[in-house]
Amino acid sequence: MNKKALAVILTGAMAGTLLAGCGSSGSTTASSTAASDSAAASTEAAAAASTAVESTAAESSASDTSSKNLPEVSSDPITITMWDIATEDPGKSTMETAVQEFMKDYPQVTVEENHLQNDNYKQQLVVAMSSGQCPDMYVSWGGGPLTEYYKSGFVNDLSDLYNNYDHPDFFDSAIAQGTIDGKLAAIPFNGISGCCVYYNKTIFNEVGLEVPTTIDELEDCCEKLKAAGYTPFSLANGSKWTGSMYYMYLVARHSGNDEFNAAYTQENGGSFTSEAFVWASDKIQDWVKKGYFPDGVNSLSTDDGQDRQLMYDGTCAMMLHGSWQCGSMYTDNADWYTQNIGVFRFPEDAEAKANGVPQDVEVGTAIDTAFSFNCWNSDGTVDQNKLNACYILATQYINNDEYNMKKIQLENKVLNINGYDQYITDENMKTVNKIFQDASNVQLWYDQYLPASVTEVHKNCMTELFGLEKNGQEIGEEEDAAMQAALADSNS
């Protein structure tokens, strides 16, 4: 076990930084909004959901499960400790139902399910790992923390199970995000949480604009919007991670995943001062100077909905934000949202595309949540029987049709499994689903991927960038120094 690496993570977790940011806050907002909508929905909607489940959910029955190609679980008693973050309904009851169905079909297995609050979850998980009490099955998100769990010996390699036995037809991007060093480290569930551009269709029609597909076209739209009296982008960067969305997408469009991956390792010349990062920074500061963002972006709060308000009152025409904003805007004013708001994927960098840079890397998380497994015998070998049971639970019960239809109907989730798009009713969410279904990979939010100490530096750099306090070279040097320090701590 790499105890030093865990200590570094624990320090960051106790500071409360690992969960801060766009990915985690977005997932919470989307779920709570959807839950509120569902609670207020009529029994007719619930009946429709039930009908849809019954028409497609044969996989949840014991007979159908037994007919599948699944690993063997012995008749010997097994106890699985399981940690999740489903503390409120409908998610809590949906998870518990899946677990109960599994135990009914596998009576020799007892699942001790623990629901933990999201805010302190990572801190509690690392404490459990450090004290030898890591659960057998636990929620993870991918990125830097999962990599450290894997390196520290708390993650089973699921590649052989996944390659040889039945599983849901996950998006390629979801499996890629759950893979570390070529080994599958997590089974996704609960869908995606992605980033996209919201735009006011009414304003676009008024100004005579088409949805831009390249960054050059996007900048042309911005100039025409400015000329018509509109601020192109709504942005509330008081939380800092909101501005990072522009930075992440511009880097991804200019270099795919390559330059970020190199900067993360700080190997073979990798640096946050590399060409893509400086180019993205220069582009953002050019947009700031041209007035593409509201005045005082660093003092506006997304938690208070100030970015959405600038869309509602017609001040701004576009907003780059997380997919959870679909639910937030719908809740605020369903009629206005339906009539006025559309979404499109972040435009491509035509020059980079001509040079062979992939333009289908999206930003967000292709695994809203996932399960990783920690099934080992006392001698350090894999407890294959328990691992088989965990794999079946995660792929055939959590992730069966009944479970997934509840996620769509009751929580407005966009799943990362092929074949469910037909059940999405929100046209904008259909677009989000298509964007991430077609993605070759998903760049996890930097503030979830980076070590905790680097995350804080990165977020502060976004304030400096949008405030024109420092340029791309300068903030890149700050991020490099933080990354090098974090790597030194984890390796010492």
Question: Could you tell me what each predicted segment is?
Answer:
Residues K224, Q266-N298:
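Glycine-centered hinge/linker elements that transmit conformational signals in sensory
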Residues E59-E72, W141-C196, E210, E219, ...:
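Hinge/lid segment of periplasmic solute-binding proteins
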Residues A98-S173, Q177-T179, T202-T213, Q309-L310, ...:
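Extracytoplasmic "Venus flytrap"/periplasmic binding protein-like
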Residues Q100, K104, T110, K290, ...:
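Extracytoplasmic/periplasmic substrate-recognition and gating elements
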Residues I180-F189, C195, E219-G269:
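Extracytoplasmic/periplasmic solute-binding protein
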Residues A128, D136, D166-T202, T231-S234, ...:
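A structural signal for short loop-to-beta-strand junctions that line the ligand-binding cleft
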Residues E72-V73, D157-F170, E210, H254-W279, ...:
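Short, solvent-exposed loop/beta-turn-alpha elements that line the ligand-binding surface or hinge
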Residues Q409-L415, K430-L487:
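C-terminal capping/gating helix-and-loop segments adjacent to ligand/active sites or protein-protein/ligand interfaces
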